Structures are given as structure tokens and as C-alpha cells.
Amino acid sequence: MIKSELVQRIAEHNPHLYQRDVENIVNAILEEIVSALARGDRVELRGFGAFSVKHRPARAGRNPRTGEHVPVEQKSVPFFKTGKEMRERLNRDGLDGATPPSPPAA
């Protein structure tokens, strides 16, 4: 699902809202999440999950073509941890309502 499909589905479930208003709301929510992460804050949506920033230290990398060692600078990356309710629902219902795959036999 892409953002425009999300906006369309929300608008369909809320006929009292114009699609452009739903789009503005979705954009505002996403912008607030990004702004909070940029400030170093954690964003927790109970039952859904939590967004945070992980800091990766500088390290030595390798160019796969030449094998040359290259320095890789430290960086910050977004991280999402699913909430308990979401994990339970996905494991219970599976994807698209299908039965989740069984674990491999030991």
C-alpha cells in the first residue's frame, strides 16, 4: 500500500471528510513523526509500534568491486519496533487472512 491508497481508504471509511483533508491529516502525522525523530524523540503508538532512531558507529567497509577498504561514516537510521497487539494479530490472522506458515520441523 502506498500513501495515496492509505488516504483513499481512510476517506472511504470517513465519508464526512474530504479526501484532500484526509491527505493533509496523513501528511501532518507523518511530518510530526519525522520531526520528533529528528529531535531524537521516540514516537510510540500503543498497539501499533514505536519509531526511534538508532545510531550506527563509523566502521571500515569494503568496496565489493575492487575489494578496497573504505571508511563508512557514523549515521543515524530510523527504526520501527512492532507493538505486541500488531504482532499478535499478524501471527493469529496471518497475511490477507491466510493461515500463517508452520515453523519448519526440527
From Swiss-Prot:
Keywords: DNA recombination, DNA-binding, Transcription, Transcription regulation, Translation regulation. It comes from Afipia carboxidovorans (strain ATCC 49405 / DSM 1227 / KCTC 32145 / OM5). Gene3D superfamilies: IHF-like DNA-binding proteins. This is Integration host factor subunit beta. InterPro entries: Hist_DNA-bd (IPR000119), Histone-like_DNA-bd_CS (IPR020816), IHF-like_DNA-bd_dom_sf (IPR010992), IHF_beta (IPR005685). The gene is ihfB. SMART domains: BHL. Residues 57-106 are annotated as: Disordered. GO terms for cellular component: chromosome; cytosol. CDD domains: IHF_B (cd13836). Heterodimer of an alpha and a beta chain. This protein is one of the two subunits of integration host factor, a specific DNA-binding protein that functions in genetic recombination as well as in transcriptional and translational control. Pfam families: Bac_DNA_binding (PF00216). One of its GO terms (biological process) is regulation of DNA-templated transcription. Residues 82-95 have a biased composition (Basic and acidic residues). GO terms for molecular function: DNA binding; structural constituent of chromatin. Signal peptide: none annotated. Belongs to the bacterial histone-like protein family. PROSITE patterns: HISTONE_LIKE.
